[in-house]
Regions:
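Acidic/histidine-rich catalytic cores and adjacent linkers
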Residues: 49-51, 59, 63, 69-70, ...
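A generic local structural motif
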Residues: 26-27, 78-83
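Conserved phosphate-handling catalytic cores of large alpha/beta enzymes
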Residues: 130-147
Length: 288
């Protein structure tokens, strides 16, 4: 329900309905409780060319948005660290991507917390490396093979379990015709198993073995991926002790997109942030 709907139902002006709603949101959600929070997820969301990026901090246990600020990186988190100190929150672990903009801020302000590099961001990066390899193969290929490889992006990056019908033989044929893509695809699929290991020791052995295999291929994009994983190994292996991810933020991201489509007057930045902070108690449905 939009503010216009609320105003019509209550026979109030749009401005009055907004003022009442904003006052209520500020009272109930303006300062999220931080005492007792143990696990954080930090990520950025993209809201279009005009609004650009927002940095979001999520309580990974109860799904609350604890902080939302325009921008990305260290600067967007400054006020949050102050609030954490005041609340004397004892953060055990933080899940974030491998961007130095976020993890360096975590190390600086939460030196006792464990930094966990997010599984889904790592797999996304692997997909990007594989897609870069596919583009290289397209540039090098000639004749029918060029078209064969060019049309495989969706098939290569998709989870093979979700492929249907003639998609499977199409993928098989493309991989059969191009050994570098075949090796890259197998490495992509094998990497998923890293987070299924049952101990830190097994996880470390798996990661080292994977990086060795990637190195043995001699493929530039796979060498680049292996180097990234080795460089960030400590935060990747921390998952064994603190199995957290920013996966919940993906669901939140979808809610935020729906929220923005409902046109709640978000030229008012403070109002938008309050709506985000209350999102865990809200349900939005687009009406056509």
């Amino acid at each position: 329900m939009t503010l216009s709907d609320v105003a019509e139902l209550t026979c109030l002006s749009w401005d009055t309905a907004k003022t009442i709603t904003k006052t209520h949101l500020a009272k109930d959600y303006g300062k999220p409780a931080l005492r007792g929070v143990r696990y954080l997820g930090i990520d950025e969301i993209y809201l279009g060319k005009k609004t650009r990026f927002y940095t979001i901090v999520l309580d990974l246990e109860d799904g609350r948005i604890l902080w939302a600020k325009p921008g990305r990186g260290k600067a967007a988190l400054q006020g949050f660290w102050r609030r954490l100190r005041v609340a004397k929150a004892k953060i055990k672990a933080v899940a974030t991507d491998m961007s130095a903009a976020y993890w360096s801020a975590v190390l600086e302000h939460l030196p006792d917390a464990v930094l966990v590099f997010d599984k889904f961001h790592i797999l996304k990066l692997m997909n990007e490396r594989l897609d870069d390899l596919r583009r290289e193969m397209v540039r090098e290929a000639v004749g029918p093979l060029k078209l064969e490889i060019k049309g495989t992006r969706f098939l290569l990056l998709r989870n093979p379990k979700s492929l249907k019908g003639d998609q499977i033989p199409k993928l098989d044929e493309a991989l059969r015709l191009n050994e570098p893509l075949l090796l890259g695809w197998y490495l992509k699929e094998e990497l998923r198993e890293l987070w299924n290991q049952t101990s830190r020791k097994q996880m470390e052995a798996f990661l080292n073995d994977w990086c060795d295999k990637a190195g043995q291929t001699g493929i530039g994009q796979m060498l680049k991926m292996a180097k990234t994983l080795r460089t960030h190994a400590s935060g990747i292996l921390a998952y064994a002790d603190h199995p957290i991810t920013t996966g919940k933020l993906e669901g939140i991201n979808n809610k935020i997109k729906t929220l923005t489509k409902c046109s709640y007057g978000f030229h008012d930045e403070n109002f938008f942030i309050l709506k985000l902070l209350s999102l865990h108690h809200s349900k939005y449905k687009l009406l056509g």
